[in-house]
């Protein structure tokens, strides 16, 4: 069976603002199946931003589990992320899920992986997915050399990634916490 490919999710933090955006392309093999997928969402009454890279069904399962952890831990992002990662690593069914999450609140940005890792990247930039390294490079250059707001850095960086990565398009979803 062919694998779903694609996605670029980027989160940038500057000052009291964090923005997260993602493209809308879903690819099966060398065919674009959907160009308008929504891979970035608000969770926990709009206080948490979350984006996914990987299998769509797997990601929705993880979103559901992550929201349950947020409810259980009163919106504590770090604790919820660690608890989800523990479950993901130890639960036989969850271990088969092929996705990665990028999550952020007003204080912290994290990557949660299926290996049980919870990572807080440096410089306030989180990038995942096939176009993640392109978007991360662009975001870092813009963050270090301009005064652009996170929203604008994410938009411009996703445009650049969309021009380079064949699994990334320019149909973005963007969410901001200020």
Curated annotation (Swiss-Prot):
Any GO CC annotation of this UniProt entry: HslUV protease complex
The organism's place on the tree of life at top rank: Bacteria
Catalytic activity field: ATP-dependent cleavage of peptide bonds with broad specificity
GO biological process, one term: proteolysis involved in protein catabolic process
Disulfide bridge map: none
Subcellular location: Cytoplasm
Record protein name field: ATP-dependent protease subunit HslV
Species annotation: Dechloromonas aromatica (strain RCB)
């Amino acid at each position: 069976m062919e694998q779903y490919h694609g996605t670029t999710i980027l989160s940038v933090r500057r000052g009291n603002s964090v923005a997260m955006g993602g493209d809308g392309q879903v690819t099966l093999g060398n065919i674009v199946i959907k160009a308008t997928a929504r891979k970035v969402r608000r969770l926990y009454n709009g206080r948490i931003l979350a984006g996914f890279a990987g299998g769509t069904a797997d990601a929705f399962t993880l979103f559901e589990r992550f929201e349950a952890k947020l409810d259980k831990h009163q919106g504590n992002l770090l604790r919820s992320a660690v608890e989800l990662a523990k479950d993901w690593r130890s639960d036989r069914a969850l271990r088969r899920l092929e996705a990665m999450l990028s999550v952020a609140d007003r204080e912290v940005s994290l990557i949660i992986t299926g290996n049980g890792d919870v990572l807080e990247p440096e410089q306030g930039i989180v990038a995942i997915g096939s176009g993640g390294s392109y978007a991360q490079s662009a975001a870092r250059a813009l963050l270090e050399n301009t005064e652009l707001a996170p929203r604008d850095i994410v938009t411009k960086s996703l445009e650049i990634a969309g021009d380079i990565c064949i699994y990334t398009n320019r149909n973005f979803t963007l969410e901001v916490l200020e």
